[in-house]
C-alpha cells in the first residue's frame, strides 16, 4: 500500500536526509540486490521500514510523538498548514501503520518480463469510408467471417526486463515505438492487441491472469487524457477516490471518512492544488480549474488508488519542466518509503527528472535496444560509437538513438554503429548488460515462483484491507453495498453541482402538463369527451414513459469516467448504475406526483382517490420501466451513433403499439406480438380501464336526430361506439371493449407485467454496465481516400495507442522549397501593452506595460512562469481577444493595424484543430484559397500548397485524412499541418505559434524547431510561446521575451550563442552563476524565484525597467516607429497591391467565393461521414416501413380513418430524433469555426451558418424520397385518389409535404442550436416546442374543443398546416365503409330503414347498410372521407396554401438561425485605450484561466443565450 503519495512541496528538514542521499541509498540497495541474488520481498520491505524508521527518528516531528490524523495545526504533518512536508508526513504515516498491530501488512509488486511479444491485426494505413464506398467493407467482412484475418502487426518484440518493488523505470521512445502498449501490457489492459502465449510475466509470484481477475486495482495504467465529472469540485473528486480505496482498519484511530478527508488534503497539498479544493474540475466545455491543474487532479486521483504497481503514460503532458521534475520526485519518495513500483513513459524529460529513475527501457519501433540502470545507459551507447552533444539531456540522447536524423556518430565509427532497429536489438542481445539482466530475471523468477508463498501473503494483505462483506477474489476494496453508498453520495454531489438539467426537466414537464391540462380543461362526463379522454391519457402515458429519454446522453457522457474508475478497481460500474437510479428516484417521484396531479385534476379525470393514486402509481412505475429501457440501450451499445437509430425505431414501435394509434383488432397478425412486449401498451390499458370501467356516460349525440326525429326508445341510438339502442348512456366498459378490446379484469395484472419488464430491463442494464465497454480508438494509422494511395503492407510495427513513427524522411529541405516563402519586410512592434479584465466587479491587470518587436528573419521566444500571461499576450498581439480592455501601441511598419491584420498573420494554436474528414492537402488548399489575396490566380494558390507540402516534408501523408486525435495523423503530423495551414495563407506580416512543442517528444520537438528555423532563414518573422524547453532547443531562438507573474517583463533581448547574453544580463544584475551543464531556460526561472522551492529578493521587473537594455528597447521602438511610418506599402513584395483596397478588407476572398468553398467542404464532410448519412437513412426508412406495414392497406372504416390520421401523426415522431442527429454535428463544426477559422478571418459567419443549413437540403430531399416510398404506399393512401383518377398528382403532393417536413425539421434544428452551447440544451428546447406544435395541431383536440386562449397557438403551429395538407392529400374524395362494430343499430318508427333515415342522411351524411329492412337498421354515420376531413379542418382546396405556408416556416427558421447566431455568438471587439490606467497587478492568473474567463461582451452573449 502506498501510504505516502508524496508531494510537490516536500520541504526537507535540516536533519532529514536529502532526496539525493535517499536515492543513493536506494541505488546502493539495488547493487546489493544484484550482487547477492534477488532479495526476498520480506527482506526488501524490512530494509525499507528500517530506513523509514531511521529517518523518522531524525525528524523534528517524530512519528512516535504525533499521529498524522491528529497533527498539530501548522505543523509539518498538517496538510492544511503552510509548513506541510510531504516527506515528513509519509514517514510519520508509515510509522503509525507499523505500530498498529491491526493494520494490514504492506504489499509490494515488482515485475519481471521475458520473451514479451505483443501483436495486433490490421494495416499501417486504411481507406476513408464514404457514402459511396462503405459498401465495399462488406467484402472484407465476408472474408473475416470465412476465417481470413488481417495482417499481423508486431508491436513489441522480445522484450526483457526486471523492475523490482521500490524501483522506478523510465520508458523512452518516439511515438510509435510501443511505449503505451508496453505499459498497458504490464497492467493487463490489452484491448485491441494480443500478448503472445509464450511471453513470461511474473508479478512476484502473481500471474497475469490473477492480476487481471483478482488484483486489477493493484496495477494501474494512467493515460494522458484527463476525464473527470466536470461539475464536481476537486476536493470531492479526490475524496471519492480516497474513500473508495480506504482499508477496513485505519491505523491511528481515525474513522474512514476522516481518513479519506485527510488523504485528500495531503495529496492536494503535495501536488500544489489545495487552493482548488472548492473549484469544479471542469472540462473543455465547462470552465473549471486550468489545464495544468486538471492534469494534477488526474495524477492525484491515481495516487490515491494506492496501487503498488503504477504505470504512467506521458502524465506530465501539460506540465512545465519544473512540475514534471516534482512529479518524478514524488514518485521517487513513494518507491523509497513505501516500496511502490513506478513505470513512467515521459517525453522531453529534464535531466533532473531522469536522475530520479533507477532503470531505463529504450524502445525503437517495438524493439528493445537497452534496459538497465539509468546511470549506465548513456555510456552504453557512447561505447558503441555515438556522441552526446553538449547540454543534451540523457533522456534526449537515448531517444535520439531511435532517429537517424538526430544521432551523432563519432568519427571513424560510421561503419561500426548499428543503424536499423534490428541491428540495435542484435547489438543489445549480444551485450554483457543483457546477459546480466537475464541472470537477474532467472534468479527473480526462481525466488518468486508463481503461486508461491508471496502470493499467499499478497492475498492476506489484500484481504485484510478489504471490507468483511467483500469476496476474497474480488479486486475491489469496498463491499458492493459500500460501493453503492459511495456512488450515491457522489451522485448527490453531482446533482448539487449541476441541478440545471433536473430543474429544467421538472419545469419543462410541469409546463407541458399545464398546457395539456388547459387544452383538455374540465372535460365533461359524457360521451362527447370519449376521444378527448383517450387522447389525453395517451399523451399522459407517452410523456411519462419518454421523460427519461435523455438519460442515454448522460450515460454516454459519464461512461469514460466510470470505466476508468473500474480499471482502478474503485467500484463496479453496476454500483454506479444502481446509485444513479436511486438518486433519480426522488426527482422521478416528485415529477410523477406534480405533473400528474396537475394533469389529472385540471382535466377532470375520474375524481376518486383510488383511481387517482392508481393513475399516478402506474405512471410512476412506467417511468421507471422506460428509464431502464433507455439505460439498457445505452449500456448495450458502444457509441451514441449506434444507439440513436435503434432508440428511434423502438420509440416509434412502442408508441404505435400502445393500442391507441392502432387498436388491437387493427394490428396485423405478423406484428401483433409487438403489443405483448410493449410496457406502454399495458400501462395505457390499465389507465384506460381505471378511467372508464364502472362508469356511465350520458349520451350527447343520437342517431337519428333533428326536427323530424322526435323519437325515443329503440328508435334511436347513441352515436358512440359501445352504445345500446334505447339506452341514454354508454357504459365505459362497453366503450373500451368495443373500441380497444380492453377488459377491466386486466387492470392490476398489467401493472405486474410492467414490474416484470422493469426487473428484466434493470438486470440487462446492470449486467451490460459491467461487461460492455465503450468503443475504443483504432490507433493512429494513416487513412487515405480510396484511390489516392496504395496500401503499403511492408512497413514495420505500429503502436496501437501511440501511432506511427514520425514520417520525416529527409534531414534537410532543398533550398528551392524554402524559397517559396516570400521574403517579409514588415516589422511588427508593440509598446506599453496592458490588458485588464473585469473579475467580480474588480479590474485585474493581466499584462503590464509589455514592449517588444518582431523583425523578419528572427525567431523570438515568449516565455514565463505559469500564469505570467504568455498565451494572453499572444492573443492580444494577434487580435484574438474578444474581452477586456487593451491599451498600448501595436504598429505594423509604424502604422496602426487595419481590419486585414488577422488574416495577414498566421496563428498556429496549441490545440491542433482541423476538420477530421479533410485530407492534409485539402486543409491547406482551403486555407490558401480563402486567405491568400484575391488577386492571386486560383492555380497559383494550389501550386503554392504543393510547395508548402514539400517544405514541411508532408509529401508522404499529403493525401491522408486528418482524422480525430487518436485515429489518423499522429501528434507531429498534426502539428506540421497546423503550421502548414498558416503558411498556406501566405502571412504577409508574421507567424504566431502557441506552444508548438507542448506534449511532444524530444525528437518531434526538434523537428518542429527545424521547421521554424527553415522559415526564419527565409525571412519569416516568428513569435513563439514555449514551455521551458531543453537547453538545445532554447539555443535555437534568437530573442527572448521573458515575463513574470502579473504579466510584467523581466527581460527582452537577444539570447546569444550558448545563451551568453541572457546569462550575462542576469548575473550582472545579481543572479547566481549558471552552471556549465545547466539548462539556461530552467536556470533563469530559479534566478527570478519562479521555480518550485526557489526564492529571490530582487525585483526583476524593476531591475529591467532600470536597465540599459530597457532604455535601448525604448529608443529602438521610437526609431522604428519614425522610420517605418514613412513607408506606405504594407505589402510584402507585389507593388500591384499598393493601392488595392481589397488588401485591406477583413476577408481576403469575396463573400460568394467564401460561400462556394465552405459549401463544397461541408458537402465533402457529409459525404465522408457515412455513419451520419446512413443513420439518417436508417432512421427514415426503418420508421416509415414500421409505420407503413403496421398499418398496411388500412381500410376506410371509421377507425381506419383514425388510423390513417395517426399514421401521419406517428411520422412526426421522427422530428425529435432527426434534430438530435443534426445538432451534435453542427456543434462540432461550430467549435472548429469559432476556435480557429473565425479568428483567422478565413471566412465570415454568414458563409458558415448558411452553408451548414443548405448542405442538409439535398440529403433531406433524398431522405424524403425514401421515407415517402416506404410509408405512403404500404399504408394504402394512394387508393384514396383512385376515385378521382388523381393518383399521380396526389402522390406528388404527398411527397412535397414529406419533403417540406424534413426541410422544416432541419432548419428548426439549426434555429435551436444557433445560439445555444450544447446539443442537450437545444434538444430540450426543441422537444418542448415540438410538443407544443403537436398538441396544438388539431389532431388530439379540434379547434372547437380548444379553450379560446389557445386558438392563436393552433394558427401559429407549423404542424397545423402540415397535418391539414397531408390529411387532405391522403384521405380526400373517397368513400367510407364502416366495420361491423361501427354500425349503429336501431328500429325505424315505420317504413323501411332507408325511408326512415333519408332526411337525416341529407342533413348529416352517412348511409344505411340495409335500406330495405324494416327493423334493426344498420347505419354508418359517415359515408365520405371529406366529412371526416372537416372534423379536423383539412380541406383539399387548401393544399397548396398549406404547402406555401410550410415554406414560410422553413425560411423563417433559416433567417432566425442566422439572426440568433449573430446576436448571441458573433464576437464584438474589446475596448482599446491609448493609455493604460494605473492598476496594480494583484496576484497572477494562469493564461489558460484568463482565456477561460468571461468578459463583459462574452457575458452579455452568454446572458442572451441563457435568456433565449
From Swiss-Prot:
The way this protein sits in the membrane is described as:
Multi-pass membrane protein
Q: What's one GO-annotated cellular component? A: plasma membrane
Query: Which residues are tagged as glycosylated in the record?
Result: 24, 35, 83, 231, 314, 1390
Transport as a keyword of this entry, yes or no, is: yes
- The chain positions of domain ABC transporter read 136-390, 828-1070
Compositionally biased, Polar residues: which spans?
Answer: 11-24, 55-68
Chief localisation class: membrane
One Pfam family, short name: PDR_CDR
Note whether Transmembrane occurs among the keywords.
yes
What are the subcellular locations of this protein?
Answer: Cell membrane
Q: What stretches pass through the bilayer?
A: 501-521, 536-556, 610-630, 643-663, 752-772, 1172-1192, 1206-1226, 1296-1316, 1322-1342, 1443-1463
UniProt cross-references to SMART domains, sorted A to Z: AAA (SM00382)
Q: What does this protein do?
A: ABC-type transporter; part of the gene cluster that mediates the biosynthesis of the sesterterpenes ophiobolins, fungal phytotoxins with potential anti-cancer activities. Acts as a specific transporter involved in ophiobolins secretion.
Q: Which family does it belong to?
A: Belongs to the ABC transporter superfamily. ABCG family. PDR (TC 3.A.1.205) subfamily.
Q: What is this protein called in UniProt?
A: ABC-type transporter oblD
- What is the native source organism of this protein? Cochliobolus heterostrophus (strain C5 / ATCC 48332 / race O) (Southern corn leaf blight fungus)
Q: Which gene encodes it?
A: oblD
Amino acid at each position: 500500500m502506498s501510504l505516502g503519495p508524496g508531494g510537490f512541496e516536500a520541504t526537507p528538514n535540516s536533519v532529514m536526509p536529502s532526496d539525493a542521499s535517499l536515492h543513493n541509498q536506494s541505488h546502493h540497495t539495488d547493487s546489493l540486490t544484484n550482487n547477492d541474488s534477488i532479495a526476498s520481498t520480506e527482506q526488501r520491505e524490512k530494509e525499507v521500514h528500517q530506513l523509514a524508521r531511521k529517518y523518522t527518528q531524525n525528524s523534528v516531528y517524530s512519528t512516535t510523538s504525533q499521529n498524522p490524523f491528529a497533527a498539530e495545526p501548522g505543523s509539518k504533518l498538517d496538510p492544511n498548514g503552510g509548513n506541510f512536508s510531504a516527506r515528513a508526513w509519509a514517514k510519520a504515516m508509515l510509522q503509525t501503520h507499523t505500530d498498529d498491530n491491526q493494520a494490514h501488512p504492506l504489499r509490494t509488486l515488482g515485475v519481471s518480463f521475458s520473451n514479451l511479444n505483443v501483436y495486433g491485426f490490421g494495416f499501417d494505413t486504411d481507406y476513408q469510408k464514404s457514402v459511396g464506398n462503405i459498401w465495399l467493407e462488406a467484402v472484407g467482412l465476408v472474408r473475416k467471417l470465412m476465417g481470413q484475418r488481417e495482417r499481423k502487426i508486431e508491436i513489441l518484440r522480445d522484450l526483457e526486463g526486471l523492475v523490482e518493488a521500490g524501483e522506478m523505470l523510465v520508458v523512452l521512445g518516439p511515438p510509435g515505438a510501443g511505449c503505451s502498449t508496453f505499459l498497458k501490457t504490464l497492467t493487463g489492459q490489452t484491448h485491441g492487441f494480443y500478448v503472445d502465449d509464450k511471453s513470461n510475466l511474473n508479478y512476484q509470484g502473481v500471474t497475469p491472469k490473477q492480476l487481471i481477475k483478482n488484483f486489477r486495482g493493484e496495477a494501474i495504467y494512467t493515460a494522458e487524457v484527463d476525464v473527470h465529472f466536470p461539475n464536481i469540485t476537486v476536493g470531492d473528486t479526490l475524496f471519492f477516490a480516497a474513500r473508495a480505496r480506504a482499508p477496513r482498519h485505519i491505523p491511528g484511530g481515525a474513522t474512514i471518512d476522516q481518513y479519506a478527508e485527510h488523504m485528500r488534503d495531503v495529496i492536494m497539498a503535495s501536488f500544489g492544488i489545495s487552493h482548488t479544493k472548492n473549484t469544479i474540475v471542469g472540462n473543455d466545455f465547462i470552465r473549471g480549474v486550468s489545464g495544468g491543474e486538471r492534469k494534477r487532479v488526474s495524477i492525484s486521483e491515481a495516487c490515491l488508488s494506492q496501487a503498488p504497481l503504477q504505470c504512467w503514460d506521458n502524465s506530465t503532458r501539460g506540465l512545465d519542466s519544473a512540475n514534471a521534475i516534482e512529479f518524478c520526485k514524488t514518485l521517487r519518495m513513494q518507491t523509497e518509503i513505501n516500496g511502490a513500483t513506478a513505470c513512467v513513459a515521459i517525453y522531453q524529460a529534464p535531466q533532473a527528472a531522469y536522475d530520479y529513475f533507477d532503470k531505463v527501457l529504450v524502445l525503437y519501433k517495438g524493439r528493445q535496444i537497452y534496459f538497465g540502470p539509468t546511470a549506465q545507459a548513456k555510456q552504453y551507447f557512447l561505447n558503441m560509437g555515438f556522441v552526446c552533444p553538449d547540454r543534451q539531456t540523457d533522456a534526449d540522447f537515448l531517444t535520439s538513438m531511435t532517429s537517424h536524423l538526430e544521432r551523432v556518430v563519432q568519427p571513424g565509427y560510421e561503419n561500426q554503429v548499428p543503424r536499423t532497429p534490428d541491428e540495435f536489438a542484435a547489438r543489445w542481445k549480444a551485450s554483457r548488460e543483457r546477459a546480466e539482466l537475464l541472470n537477474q530475471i532467472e534468479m527473480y523468477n526462481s525466488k518468486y515462483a508463481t503461486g508461491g508463498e508471496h502470493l499467499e501473503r499478497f492475498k492476506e494483505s489484500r484481504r485484510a484491507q478489504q471490507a468483511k462483506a467483500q469476496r476474497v477474489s474480488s479486486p475491489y476494496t469496498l463491499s458492493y453495498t459500500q460501493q453503492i453508498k459511495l456512488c450515491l453520495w457522489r451522485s448527490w454531489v453531482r446533482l448539487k453541482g449541476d441541478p440545471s438539467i433536473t430543474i429544467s426537466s421538472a419545469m419543462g414537464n410541469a409546463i407541458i402538463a399545464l398546457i395539456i391540462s388547459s387544452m383538455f380543461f374540465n372535460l365533461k362526463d359524457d360521451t362527447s369527451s370519449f376521444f378527448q379522454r383517450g387522447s389525453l391519457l395517451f399523451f399522459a402515458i407517452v410523456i411519462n414513459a419518454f421523460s427519461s429519454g435523455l438519460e442515454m446522453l448522460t450515460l454516454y457522457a459519464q461512461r469514460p469516467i466510470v470505466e476508468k474508475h473500474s480499471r482502478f478497481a474503485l467500484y463496479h460500474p453496476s454500483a454506479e448504475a444502481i446509485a444513479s437510479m436511486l438518486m433519480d428516484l426522488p426527482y422521478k417521484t416528485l415529477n410523477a406526483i406534480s405533473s400528474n396531479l396537475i394533469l389529472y385534476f385540471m382535466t377532470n379525470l375520474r375524481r376518486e382517490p383510488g383511481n387517482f393514486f392508481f393513475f399516478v402509481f402506474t405512471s410512476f412505475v412506467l417511468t421507471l420501466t422506460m428509464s431502464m429501457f433507455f439505460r439498457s440501450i445505452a449500456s448495450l451499445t458502444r457509441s451514441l451513433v449506434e444507439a440513436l437509430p435503434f432508440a428511434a425505431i423502438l420509440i416509434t414501435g412502442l408508441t404505435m403499439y400502445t393500442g391507441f394509434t392502432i387498436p388491437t383488432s387493427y394490428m396485423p397478425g405478423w406484428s401483433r406480438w409487438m403489443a405483448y412486449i410493449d410496457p406502454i401498451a399495458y400501462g395505457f390499458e390499465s389507465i384506460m380501464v381505471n378511467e372508464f370501467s364502472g362508469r356511465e356516460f350520458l349520451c350527447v349525440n343520437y342517431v337519428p336526430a333533428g326536427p323530424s326525429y322526435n323519437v325515443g326508445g329503440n328508435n334511436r341510438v347513441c352515436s358512440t361506439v359501445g352504445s345500446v339502442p334505447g339506452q341514454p348512456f354508454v357504459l365505459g366498459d362497453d366503450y373500451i371493449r368495443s373500441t380497444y378490446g380492453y377488459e377491466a379484469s386486466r387492470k392490476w395484472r398489467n401493472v405486474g407485467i410492467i414490474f416484470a419488464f422493469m426487473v428484466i430491463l434493470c438486470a440487462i442494464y446492470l449486467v451490460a454496465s459491467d461487461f460492455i465497454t465503450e468503443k475504443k480508438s483504432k490507433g493512429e494509422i494513416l487513412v487515405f481516400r480510396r484511390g489516392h494511395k496504395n496500401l503499403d503492407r511492408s512497413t514495420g510495427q505500429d503502436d496501437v495507442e501511440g501511432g506511427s513513427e514520425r514520417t520525416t524522411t529527409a534531414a534537410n529541405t532543398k533550398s528551392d522549397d524554402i524559397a517559396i516563402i516570400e521574403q517579409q519586410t514588415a516589422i511588427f512592434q508593440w509598446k506599453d501593452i496592458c490588458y485588464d479584465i473585469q473579475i467580480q466587479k474588480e479590474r485585474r491587470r493581466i499584462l503590464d506595460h509589455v514592449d517588444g518587436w518582431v523583425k523578419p528573419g528572427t525567431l523570438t521566444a515568449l516565455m514565463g512562469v505559469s500564469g505570467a500571461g504568455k498565451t494572453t499576450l499572444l492573443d492580444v498581439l494577434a487580435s484574438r481577444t474578444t474581452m477586456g480592455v487593451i491599451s498600448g501601441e501595436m504598429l505594423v511598419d509604424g502604422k496602426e493595424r487595419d481590419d486585414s491584420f488577422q488574416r495577414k498573420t498566421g496563428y498556429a494554436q496549441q490545440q491542433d484543430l482541423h476538420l477530421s474528414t479533410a485530407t492534409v492537402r485539402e486543409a491547406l488548399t482551403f486555407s490558401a484559397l480563402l486567405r491568400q489575396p484575391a488577386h492571386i490566380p486560383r492555380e497559383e494558390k494550389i501550386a503554392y500548397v504543393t510547395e508548402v507540402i514539400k517544405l514541411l516534408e508532408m509529401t508522404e501523408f499529403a493525401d491522408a485524412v486528418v482524422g480525430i486525435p487518436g485515429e489518423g495523423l499522429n501528434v507531429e503530423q498534426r502539428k506540421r499541418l497546423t503550421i502548414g495551414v498558416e503558411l498556406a495563407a501566405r502571412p504577409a506580416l508574421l507567424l504566431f505559434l502557441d506552444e508548438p512543442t507542448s506534449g511532444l517528444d524530444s525528437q518531434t520537438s526538434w523537428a518542429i524547431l527545424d521547421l521554424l528555423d527553415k522559415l526564419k532563414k527565409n525571412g519569416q518573422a516568428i513569435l513563439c510561446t514555449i514551455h521551458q524547453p531543453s537547453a538545445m532547443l532554447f539555443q535555437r531562438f534568437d530573442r527572448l521575451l521573458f515575463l513574470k507573474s502579473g504579466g510584467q517583463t523581466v527581460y527582452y533581448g537577444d539570447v546569444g550563442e550558448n545563451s551568453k547574453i541572457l546569462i550575462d544580463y542576469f548575473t550582472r544584475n545579481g543572479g547566481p552563476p549558471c552552471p556549465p551543464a545547466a539548462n539556461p531556460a530552467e536556470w533563469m526561472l530559479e534566478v527570478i524565484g519562479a521555480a518550485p522551492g526557489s526564492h529571490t529578493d530582487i525585483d526583476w521587473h524593476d531591475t529591467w525597467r532600470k536597465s540599459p537594455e530597457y532604455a535601448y528597447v525604448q529608443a529602438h521602438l521610437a526609431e522604428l516607429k519614425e522610420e517605418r511610418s514613412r513607408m506606405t506599402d504594407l505589402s510584402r513584395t507585389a507593388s500591384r497591391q499598393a493601392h488595392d483596397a481589397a488588401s485591406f478588407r477583413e476577408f481576403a476572398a469575396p463573400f460568394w467565393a467564401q460561400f462556394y468553398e465552405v459549401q463544397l467542404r461541408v458537402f465533402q464532410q457529409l459525404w465522408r461521414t457515412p455513419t451520419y448519412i446512413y443513420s439518417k437513412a436508417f432512421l427514415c426508412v426503418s420508421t416509415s416501413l414500421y409505420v407503413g406495414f403496421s398499418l398496411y392497406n388500412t381500410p376506410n372504416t371509421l377507425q381506419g380513418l383514425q388510423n390513417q390520421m395517426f399514421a401521419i401523426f406517428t411520422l412526426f415522431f421522427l422530428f425529435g430524433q432527426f434534430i438530435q442527429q443534426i445538432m451534435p454535428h453542427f456543434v462540432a463544426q461550430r467549435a472548429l469555426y469559432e476556435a480557429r477559422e473565425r479568428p483567422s478571418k478565413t471566412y465570415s459567419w454568414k458563409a458558415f451558418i448558411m452553408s451548414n443549413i443548405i448542405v442538409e437540403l439535398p440529403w433531406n430531399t433524398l431522405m424524403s424520397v425514401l421515407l415517402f416510398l416506404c410509408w405512403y404506399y404500404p399504408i394504402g393512401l394512394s387508393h384514396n385518389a383512385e376515385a378521382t383518377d388523381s393518383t399521380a398528382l396526389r402522390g406528388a403532393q404527398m411527397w412535397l409535404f414529406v419533403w417540406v417536413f424534413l426541410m422544416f425539421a432541419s432548419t428548426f434544428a439549426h434555429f435551436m442550436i444557433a445560439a445555444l452551447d450544447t446539443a442537450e440544451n437545444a434538444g430540450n428546447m426543441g422537444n418542448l416546442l415540438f410538443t407544443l406544435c403537436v398538441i396544438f395541431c388539431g389532431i388530439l383536440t379540434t379547434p372547437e374543443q380548444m379553450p379560446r386562449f389557445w386558438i392563436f397557438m393552433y394558427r401559429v403551429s407549423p404542424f397545423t398546416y402540415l397535418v391539414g395538407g397531408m390529411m387532405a392529400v391522403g384521405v380526400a374524395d373517397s368513400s367510407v365503409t364502416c366495420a361491423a362494430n361501427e354500425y349503429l343499430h336501431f328500429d325505424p318508427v315505420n317504413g323501411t330503414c332507408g325511408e326512415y333515415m333519408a332526411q337525416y342522411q341529407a342533413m348529416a351524411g352517412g348511409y344505411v347498410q340495409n335500406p330495405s329492412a324494416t327493423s334493426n337498421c344498420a347505419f354508418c354515420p359517415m359515408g365520405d372521407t371529406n366529412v371526416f376531413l372537416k372534423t379536423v379542418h383539412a380541406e383539399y382546396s387548401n393544399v397548396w396554401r398549406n404547402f406555401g405556408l410550410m415554406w414560410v416556416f422553413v425560411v423563417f427558421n433559416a433567417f432566425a438561425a442566422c439572426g440568433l447566431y449573430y446576436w448571441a455568438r458573433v464576437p464584438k471587439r474589446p475596448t482599446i485605450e491609448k493609455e493604460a490606467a494605473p492598476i496594480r497587478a494583484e496576484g497572477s492568473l494562469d493564461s489558460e484561466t484568463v482565456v477561460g474567463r468571461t468578459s463583459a461582451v462574452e457575458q452579455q452573449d452568454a446572458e442572451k443565450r441563457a435568456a433565449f
